[in-house]
Amino acid sequence: MNYNANVVKFHSTILHKFALKISKFLILCMRRNKRQLACMKCQCENPMAAITYADIEYPHNTHFLLLDSISWIPCTCKILKLKEFELPDRFDIPNLFYDGWLSYVFHTFSGVYLKIGYEMDESGFCLPDQVYHLIDNHSCIQTAVSHLLRNHQALFKYLCDYLRSGEFPLTVLIHHVMLYQYYPKSLQEALWAAVEHYVNNSGEAYSTVQKLAVQKKIGNIRMYLVNPRDIFALGSTCNCIVVSSSNFQSYVQLRKPLLENNLPYEIDGFDKILQCANSEADIGWIAMIHCIGSNGYAFPIHLYLNMKKNIFLGKLPESTLLLYNSDGAIFKNPPSSKKECDFYNQLLLDLCKCRQFNAEMECNMKKLFNNPTGLHSLPNLPNFSEAGSAKSSNFCSSKDNCLTNRLTLNCLDTPSDENGEDIAIQLIIPAE
């Protein structure tokens, strides 16, 4: 009897341990499926995956205020002895948003969030609301980005050359501005130079204050790509602004209240920038771009510009928080072979777009030079310089089986060496 009892007890113990392990495994799977982890080491969230969040309502305002209307600006202008500005006929405008992208950027103690959806248009198309959590500066992201940059330094150097020279299409600028906060200082400096070129040459009627502000790198870099005429204040609060048009609207909570004592007077030369103001709206704008802080990194700039300029030719961008799904490689430590290949293939396509853009601009300039009657229409011809050289590079340095097919690009889109000869860059197509 004792023997049988011991056997039963032994087997029941084994079954209990087995059931316990199975239950723990299932719970872990459910948690990972729910959180959609970005990094298995630290189990941080994947910011490109929508999360469940307590219901938060969009602000609803029937009227917005021009930046000229901020109450403390007239007093500040008198203290700074600025010239008297011509005031607009009215300070408030009706909310003209009808359909399209509707979003809300807000922050809590746990970070910055983006709530976004697509309001139904005439065709009946709509997208349900989703919430994303922005991971700003996590150690695993820094490690992953360092890994990507270290393996392919020449390609990023070539990208920096294009950005600094102003030889890039808008889609390339948007792509890398949306990765700005994850990049090292050298790439950030190149992006500031590129945005400065955009502000000075985009034809969006940027004021002198805005052009000087981008030189000083004041505020959040994304917000320089927003037409200043689309930014409004809210009469009910000084903690939020809105970017609005007929088919795009985004409420953005500010990191600091939009108050006079939050102007960045500590920045060298800031007083001189204010002296160049042409309107009270300039004062409100520079206060906004400084007070928005890191919340601006969650503003969906690619969706805004697509609605304004149709830069994606009627297509929806791949991702909501970033531009391409391949950018998710920076949230994996270490990135998987396929994701790393996808990331570098997209980087190659960006370089190809820059090369094509440069070639088309040079072709247009040659036509103008060959047609002297058309030269007077160009007040300032841009000085295009030769982009820096780049060596032939494989986009995936790993030796695994993900590299099964290589497509050589021999066209206008390929970089050239010191002798001006095209270099064959290999586009890597990972195995399915």
From Swiss-Prot:
Identify its protein family: Belongs to the UPF0300 family.
Q: Does the keyword Cytoplasm belong to this entry?
A: yes
A GO biological process held by the record: meiotic cell cycle
Can you say what this protein is called?
Meiotically up-regulated gene 134 protein
GO cellular component terms, semicolon-separated: cell cortex
**Residues passing through the membrane, by range:** none
Biological source species: Schizosaccharomyces pombe (strain 972 / ATCC 24843)
Annotated localization: Cytoplasm, Cell cortex
What does the function comment of this entry state? Has a role in meiosis.
Keywords attached to this entry? Cytoplasm, Meiosis
